[in-house]
Amino acid sequence: MNKSENLLFAGSSLASQVHAAAVNGDKGALQRLIVGNSALKDKEDQFGRTPLMYCVLADRLDCADALLKAGADVNKTDHSQRTALHLAAQKGNYRFMKLLLTRRANWMQKDLEEMTPLHLTTRHRSPKCLALLLKFMAPGEVDTQDKNKQTALHWSAYYNNPEHVKLLIKHDSNIGIPDVEGKIPLHWAANHKDPSAVHTVRCILDAAPTESLLNWQDYEGRTPLHFAVADGNVTVVDVLTSYESCNITSYDNLFRTPLHWAALLGHAQIVHLLLERNKSGTIPSDSQGATPLHYAAQSNFAETVKVFLKHPSVKDDSDLEGRTSFMWAAGKGSDDVLRTMLSLKSDIDINMADKYGGTALHAAALSGHVSTVKLLLENNAQVDATDVMKHTPLFRACEMGHKDVIQTLIKGGARVDLVDQDGHSLLHWAALGGNADVCQILIENKINPNVQDYAGRTPLQCAAYGGYINCMAVLMENNADPNIQDKEGRTALHWSCNNGYLDAIKLLLDFAAFPNQMENNEERYTPLDYALLGERHEVIQFMLEHGALSIAAIQDIAAFKIQAVYKGYKVRKAFRDRKNLLMKHEQLRKDAAAKKREEENKRKEAEQQKGRRSPDSCRPQALPCLPSTQDVPSRQSRAPSKQPPAGNVAQGPEPRDSRGSPGGSLGGALQKEQHVSSDLQGTNSRRPNETAREHSKGQSACVHFRPNEGSDGSRHPGVPSVEKSRGETAGDERCAKGKGFVKQPSCIRVAGPDEKGEDSRRAAASLPPHDSHWKPSRRHDTEPKAKCAPQKRRTQELRGGRCSPAGSSRPGSARGEAVHAGQNPPHHRTPRNKVTQAKLTGGLYSHLPQSTEELRSGARRLETSTLSEDFQVSKETDPAPGPLSGQSVNIDLLPVELRLQIIQRERRRKELFRKKNKAAAVIQRAWRSYQLRKHLSHLRHMKQLGAGDVDRWRQESTALLLQVWRKELELKFPQTTAVSKAPKSPSKGTSGTKSTKHSVLKQIYGCSHEGKIHHPTRSVKASSVLRLNSVSNLQCIHLLENSGRSKNFSYNLQSATQPKNKTKP
C-alpha cells in the first residue's frame, strides 16, 4: 500500500506532498509543510481522506501524533463516512484506537452502512480492541444495530468468535434481537460448517437455554436446527437436539423439516441422528406430500435411502399425486437408489401407477434416462402401460425427443401404432416437439405420415403450428400431403400463415400446397385471410405473389360465375318457353286439320253409304267404265304414239286441285274428254317432282296416295281402301280420271280358293260386261258419285291384315302390287293354271333388288320395273277381269292412330325376326364349339385307352389339325332349287304353311332352305347357306345366311381375298 501511495503522489501538487509525507512517515517534511500552510493538516484527497487517515492506514504513529498536536480533526470523515477510528478498528490496531480515543474520537460514528467501530472490531480474533471500546461505551450502546439491524453479537456469532460473544453477553448484550431476516445470533452461530462453531452455540445457549430461543424461526420459518442440518454440522445438530425442548419436526415455510433437508442433501449421519431422536415416531411430509425418503431417492443418495429403509418407522408412502419414492428415483435417473430399493424391498411394485396412470417407466422415458429405462425393462416393467391420456412411455419419449429412449423402447417391444385419447399418434407428438430425427425414426417404423387425429389434424399441421421447418421437410419428403384439411377445413398453410412463419410457408408452397384452401366454418377463411388478420406483411406479400386469394376475392369470382350461369339459364328457359309455345300452336293446327279431315271422311262415308243404297245411280249413264289393268297394254300397243313414256308414267300422280269436288258432273266430264291425251302429255314434265313428293309421304308399304283428277282440271281426292278379307267382294268399282300409273310396294293378299268364286260373282255383279272386242274410248268416264266401300269395313281390313314391305327380310313376307294412279285398281284374276301363276309371281319378283342396300337406294327403279311387270302379266294372263286382291288407300284419309298401329306392328315383326337371327347365330357358334370340344374329348379319351390305339389316335389328330389350321373345311351349297326358278303362286295359304313349317334350328342345321329361297329381295349369294362337311367325325354345321359376311379369323377361315374352293353337293 505504501508503494501505491508513493506512486499516487509522485510528481503531485503541494497537497499531495502532505499525504505522501504522511504515508511515507516523513515527519520532518510533514511538519515543514504544515508550518508553511496550516490548512494542509486536514487537506482531503480524491477519496476524502486526510493525512491522519493515511497515517492510520500506513501505521505511522509518530506522524499521527504530530498531526494531532498540530490540531488535526480526529473525527474528520471520508466519502464513505468513516473516521480514523473506523479505520483503526477495521485494522484491529489497538495503539491507534487508544490514541484516537484519548483524543476524544467519536466511537458512535456510523458509516454509510450504519456500522460503528464496535461492529468492525468483531472481525478480529483478538478481543482487546472490543474490550477497549466497551470501556468507553455506555451500557445501552452495546446493542447498536447497523443497516441490517445486526448488533455486534450477530457479527461475533457470524465470525464464530466465542470470546467476543462471551464479552458482549457480559456487557449485557441482548441475544434475542432479530436482524432484518428475523435471525438471532443463535441462527448465525449454527449456520457454520466449522465444528468449532459448537462453542459459540454453547456460549449463547448457556446464557439463555430457553425453548423459544432454541426453536426460534426466522422469517422463512427455519430454526437453528435447519441451518445446522443444511451445513451438515453433525456436532451442532447433536448439541441442538440434545435439548429436550428442541423440535426436530419443525416445518419451515416450504413445509420441510430438518429431516427433509438432511435427506435432500444426503447427510446420512444426520438422518440417522434425527431418526433416533424423533420422539413422535412418524415421518412428516412436506407441502407436496413427499417424505424425506422421496428427497433422498430423487437425489440418488443410496446410503441415505438405505438408512431410511432400515429404520422401522419409514415407509414408502406416496405423495399427493400418488408417486412413490421409487417413481421419483426413476424420474431423476437414480439408478443406484433403484437398485438399492429393488434389493432391499422385495415387495416393491415396479408397475405401480400414480393417480394419472403414470408408472416409473413413464417417468424415466419422459426424463430421457436410457440406463434407467433399460434397468426397468430388465425388471419386467410393462412397456405399453397407458396413463389416463392413453400415453405409453413411448409417447413421453417422442414428445421430449429422446431418440435413444425411443429406440430402446421399440426394441423392448413397444407398439408404434397406438393413439391417445385425442387420436394423436406418436408422430403427432414428435411433430409438436419439432423433433425431426424422431419423426424419421417413426416413419421408418411404418407410421403413416398422413395419419389424422380425431380433429383431422396431421403431423404436418402440428409441425407447421410450431414452425419446425426441419420436421416439416422430413414429413413432406416422406409423402406427407400438405393439402389435407382438418375437420374445420384448415391446412398446414393456415397455421403457418397464422403464426407468420415465412420459411415454413415457402417450404409448403414448394411442395405444391394449395394457397386458396377455405375453412369449413362460417367465415371460410383462406391462409391469406389468416395472414391479413395477424398483419403479417411479409407473408401477405409472398402469398399474393404466389396466387393466394382472400375469401372476399373468391366470393367475387364465384358471384361473377353464378351470374353468368344464371343468365345462360334464363336464356335457355326463355327458348324452351318459346319452343313449347310454338309446338303448342303447331299441335293446335294439326288437331284442327285432323278434325277437318275426319269431318270430310264422315261426309264421304255417308255419301258412299247413300250410293250403296241406290246402286243404279253409281253406274255411268252414257259411258262405260275404264278398262282394267290387263287391257292397258293392248290399248298402248294400238296407240303407241299417244302413250306417255314409261319413265313419266311411272312417276307419282298429279297434284289434286282443291277446286274440284268428289262427285263431278257428267257434263263437265264429257266436255273435257277430248283433252285427255294433251293433258297427259303436258303433265309429264311435272310428274317427277310430284311423284317424289307423293312417294315421301308413304310411311307404310300398305298405304298409298291415289289422287284423282277431274275432267275439268280439278283434282278429286282418292278413296282409301285396304286388302279384302275372306268373303269380301272385289266388285266395288271406282271410276277415276287419271293420266298414268303409279307402282308402289303394297301388302298384296292373294285370294284363297274359297274366295275366288265369291270374288268372281261380286266382280260380275259390280263390273260392266267385258268384251274382248271392246275398245276403250279416249274419253274417260266420269267418277261415280257413290263411293266403293264403307270406311268401317276398310278399317277392319287394315287391322286384320298383315302388311309387309318389299324390303322385309322374312322369306315370303314381301309382295309387290301394281296400282293404277288414275283409275280404280285392276281386278287381279287368279291364274287358270300353275304355270300362269308362276309366271305372274316370277314377273312380279324378277326385277326386285337383290340386297337391302339396293332396295333402299332404288325406290324409283322399283316402281318403274313393277309397272312394266304389271303390263307383261296382263298380256300373259286371261284378259277377263278377276276378283280384286287389294285396294289402294289414301294415307291422308286414314286416322293417325291406325297409321301408327300399322307402323308399330311392322317394326315389332322386324325386331322379332332380327332377334331370331341373332339367337340362331349364337346357337350356331355354340353348336360348332360343342362339336369341336366333343371331338377333342374323343381324341383325349383314345389316348388314355392304351398303346394299341396310338396310331389311330395320331392319324385322327393329324387330320383334324391339318384341316383346322390349313382351313380346308369343305363348304357345300344347300341342295335346293335355284333362286331364279319361279316360285309358287304367292297365295296366302302357301306362305302361311311355309312359315309354320320352318324353325330357327332347322335354318341353323340346314334341314330346310325353302324359306330363304322365296325372299324376293335376297340375292343368290345371300340365300346360299354355307355348311361344313363332316371332318374327323365332326357333324355338318349349317351357318346362317349372314355367315358369308362374318369376320374371317386366321385360325379357322381363309382370308376374304383368297378364293374359296366350293364343291357341289
From Swiss-Prot:
Disulfide bonds: none
GO biological process: one example: protein localization to ciliary inversin compartment
Biased composition (Polar residues): 627-640, 677-686
Keyword field contains Phosphoprotein: yes
SUPFAM superfamilies in alphabetical order: Ankyrin repeat (SSF48403)
InterPro entries named among the record's database cross-references: Ankyrin_rpt, Ankyrin_rpt-contain_sf, IQ_motif_EF-hand-BS
Primary location: cytoplasm
Cross-referenced PROSITE patterns: ANK_REP_REGION (PS50297), ANK_REPEAT (PS50088), IQ (PS50096)
Keyword annotations from UniProtKB, A to Z: ANK repeat, Calmodulin-binding, Cell projection, Ciliopathy, Cilium, Cytoplasm, Cytoskeleton, Developmental protein, Disease variant, Hydroxylation, Membrane, Microtubule, Nephronophthisis, Nucleus, Phosphoprotein, Repeat, Ubl conjugation, Wnt signaling pathway
Single GO MF descriptor: calmodulin binding
Protein name: Inversin
Natural source organism: Homo sapiens
